[in-house]
Amino acid sequence: MKCLFIINPSSGTHAFQKSIDQFIGQLILHTNVNTIDTYFTRGKNDGLERAAKLTKNEYDFIVAVGGDGTINEIITGLIKSESKIPLAILAAGTVNDFATYLNLPNTPEAFRDMIARFKTKKIDAGYVDDHCFANVLSGGMFSDIGFLVTKEEKKKFGPLAYYINGLKMLPEQLGLSLHLKIKADEIEFEEDAALFMITNSSHVGGFPGVTP
């Protein structure tokens, strides 16, 4: 089998990226994967653009290495490519909500075993404009915090970086209000809210048990 690793070298604390050779070695030595290509992203939407160029049967599967943002990019690109190539996720971000929800392995041996079994499943994906989201779409209070936390803060503090910045933002967020118009099938209503979320899993922002 042939696979492509699309790796975000800036995700999370960079710990997984430093040990990526161990994951690749396990696949080569203990599965029927005999060809592995790697692609390191260089900036925003680079993973999307690489995945969008894929063609049917070019690879047997793709491995996305990064956090939730990287996963969303690559899924969007795969959908645009219409290649229907299966995607494996190697969580290497700060929070990794979607991988946690799916209970995906994060050690070389467990990841190897998952690939060896090669059991695929279909998942839903949400769309907003021309981008998809695998885990959550949100707006309102703290919804932009993922864009405000710097790479240096994530590397230094891990998930705690989001809470630190959240506390800093709290005073300006308290008075926030959105007027929402919601239409789903035959249901239509309006509501004022400080925050809204459309979730595809029960794990959001590092918190388990959020009802999708």
Write out the residue ranges for each language-model feature.
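Short Gly/Thr/Asp-enriched flexible loops that form oxyanion-binding sites at enzyme active sites
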Residues: 70-82
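Glycine-rich beta-strand-to-loop/alpha-helix junction loops that act as flexible
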Residues: 9, 65-67, 90-92
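Hydrophobic packing residues within well-ordered alpha-helices of enzyme cores
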Residues: 23, 47, 74, 98-99, ...
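Glycine-rich phosphate/pyrophosphate-binding beta-alpha loops
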Residues: 138, 142, 197-212
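Short glycine-/acidic-enriched loop or helix-start segments at secondary-structure transitions
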Residues: 16, 73-75, 99-100, 207-208
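ATP/NTP phosphate-donor binding region
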Residues: 1-62
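Catalytic core of DAGKc-family lipid kinases
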Residues: 41, 80-197
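Short, glycine/serine-rich, charged loops/turns that create anion-binding
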Residues: 10-11, 94, 202-203
